[in-house]
UniProtKB/Swiss-Prot annotation:
Source organism phylogeny: Bacteria, Pseudomonadati, Pseudomonadota, Gammaproteobacteria, Enterobacterales
InterPro entries: Glc_translocase_bactprenl-link, GtrA_CellWall_Glycosyl, GtrA_DPMS_TM
Function, in words: Involved in O antigen modification. Involved in the translocation of bactoprenol-linked glucose across the cytoplasmic membrane.
Protein name: Prophage bactoprenol-linked glucose translocase homolog
This protein's record includes keyword Membrane: yes
Entry keywords, A to Z: Cell inner membrane, Cell membrane, Membrane, Transmembrane, Transmembrane helix, Transport
Periplasmic side: 31-33, 86-88
Localization terms from the record: Cell inner membrane
Domain of life from the UniProt record: Bacteria
Annotated family: Belongs to the GtrA family.
Major subcellular location class: membrane
Amino acid sequence: MLKLFAKYTSIGVLNTLIHWVVFGVCIYVAHTNQALANFAGFVVAVSFSFFANAKFTFKASTTTMRYMLYVGFMGTLSATVGWAADRCALPPMITLVTFSAISLVCGFVYSKFIVFRDAK
């Protein structure tokens, strides 16, 4: 399980970079609120994360249902963190770090036990 989590984390680093860049562009260039910026970062990064983890971490086939399960869960998580950040007036960097930590742990558990549960 630790080896699997290490692979998931490696892909997560790239995913996080993608997410953070999009988030920053939305906040500092497009001047959106944090909920929208966090969700936009998620949308761009989630497909990479899904396909990379399916192939390299879980060695599983990609199906529409698996993709929808993953995107639905992670999207809800992203929107919730962004909404809470706006309600609490958190600085954008705190929002990014918070979402990155929560999504790493929750995303791994959800992927392993729900999305890719019947994979190898």
